[in-house]
Amino acid sequence: MPTNCAAAGCATTYNKHINISFHRFPLDPKRRKEWVRLVRRKNFVPGKHTFLCSKHFEASCFDLTGQTRRLKMDAVPTIFDFCTHIKSMKLKSRNLLKKNNSCSPAGPSNLKSNISSQQVLLEHSYAFRNPMEAKKRIIKLEKEIASLRRKMKTCLQKERRATRRWIKATCLVKNLEANSVLPKGTSEHMLPTALSSLPLEDFKILEQDQQDKTLLSLNLKQTKSTFI
């Protein structure tokens, strides 16, 4: 009779009053090896009384033609909440370190003991690809954001220089008009023409860079929150 589920982080226990079934690891070596691989538990060797509960299988994996729920011959477990298990193990590790620090004075031997305890716990935080891929993604996004910041700084400098030139030109033309050096109304024709020659494409690039930076920042926050 099954007592609990062998999946990492799964607390499901056998109860005849709930609609959850338990299934042994297959005897066929190839299928058994595939199940063990999908469970992703380090140094895990299932025994005769090792079970997985039905929560780790898709609905299409079950044969419901009989009175009992059975797995099909090609069924494999694919539903696991690995992220929750990692968080749980990290929390236990932090709590253990805090407890050790509060119960004993700090010293080289105690520090070594704490590190060893943490390593023992983290050894059971099974290796997954997703956290590593997330870390690489975060690093890439941070580099892209830094590049956009440099571009935006350059565009802002160009914008400030263009603005200063525009203000100086406007003041000069207005002053020449006031001293009758230029005829009245010259600024109304000259300044719009001068404005059209300014590098307005730089301002468009600045606007696009700001939008890209915002999108990358949102993407970075979502990626980090997934694995915190």
Curated annotation (Swiss-Prot):
A zinc finger (THAP-type) spans 1-80. The gene is THAP2. InterPro entries: THAP2, THAP_Znf, THAP_Znf_sf. The keyword Ribonucleoprotein does not apply. Keywords: DNA-binding, Metal-binding, Zinc, Zinc-finger. One of its GO terms (molecular function) is DNA binding. A motif (HCFC1-binding motif (HBM)) lies at residues 123-126. The keyword Zinc-finger applies. It comes from the Eukaryota. This is THAP domain-containing protein 2. Pfam families: THAP. SUPFAM superfamilies: Glucocorticoid receptor-like (DNA-binding domain). GO terms for cellular component: nucleolus; nucleus. PROSITE patterns: ZF_THAP.
